[in-house]
Amino acid sequence: MRHRRRTPHLNKPADQRKALMRALTTALLREGRITTTKARAKAIRATTEKMITLAKDGSLAARRQALAYIYDKELVRSLFEQAPERYRDRPGGYTRILRTVRRRGDGAEMAVIELV
């Protein structure tokens, strides 16, 4: 049952929210470290960890699932090459969220999310 298993809405319609999540996940996997709001960082943590777990699996089905979510085909290829040896001994927890100073314009809580 999925009762009370809500996804963070991030004050956006569903299509914009999905596009934002995909874009932030792609940016994090490409750059290794991004600065965003604390709520967005917490929201993309699960999808980023799922993509890395798929890369550790390395099967064709896992690669196709990752390609369906991540925008960049070359990024998926490099992720599937590097993730198995980089995260071999780590069963999860591939990201770290560090809180930073509030944003000057609106006072939003900011955070840095990075790959461990």
From Swiss-Prot:
Keywords: Ribonucleoprotein, Ribosomal protein. Pfam families: Ribosomal_L17. One of its GO terms (biological process) is translation. The keyword Ribosomal protein applies. The keyword Kinase does not apply. GO terms for molecular function: structural constituent of ribosome. GO terms for cellular component: cytosolic large ribosomal subunit. Part of the 50S ribosomal subunit. Contacts protein L32. Belongs to the bacterial ribosomal protein bL17 family. This is Large ribosomal subunit protein bL17. It comes from Synechococcus sp. (strain JA-3-3Ab) (Cyanobacteria bacterium Yellowstone A-Prime).
